[in-house]
Amino acid sequence: IQGTLILGNADSPVMLGSNQVIVEEQGKLSGFGGVAGNLSNSGIVDLTTYMPGNILTVGGNYTGRNGLILLQTETGGDNSKTDRLVIKGNASGRTRVAVTQAGGTGAETLNGIEVIHVSGNADNAEFIQTERITAGAYDYILKRGQGINSTNWYLISRKDIPVPQPEAVPENHDNNLR
């Protein structure tokens, strides 16, 4: 894909039957549905074409080639509405992830809001947050899951801890010295 390819719509998602879909550097894949085979991303995969909850499914492997994924998420707890990338095979390479806040006032997460799910191996995959996400008193950070969830990526909330200001140092007066 060198231009823009839009898959289906919210009422009628489309699954591309191709074995290999390549999103070139200037290309963009968006819409509703997925790719039956492998997806290589050097461009943009945009899931933000509707309200949060869009799922792009890759039936094969996903390879990030410094491409970008655009997602929308309601910033709340673990069960917040979000766009998701679901990879049935393996994931590898480096991909940047930009998340647009689509409502929500922030809340504590336990496991996090799952935004990327990989069924296969993801040892050689990097999904990197592009910018800060804040809601209320919370910052959201894109992190790889742990244990049995280590092939998935989550938006984890943490309290926005204010940076303490240095204490004022009292002036030193000679008459205080003994």
Placement of each model-derived feature along the sequence:
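Extracellular beta-solenoid/beta-roll
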Residues: 1-90, 94, 100, 105-159
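Extracytoplasmic Gram-positive cell-surface binding/anchoring modules and repeats
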Residues: 162
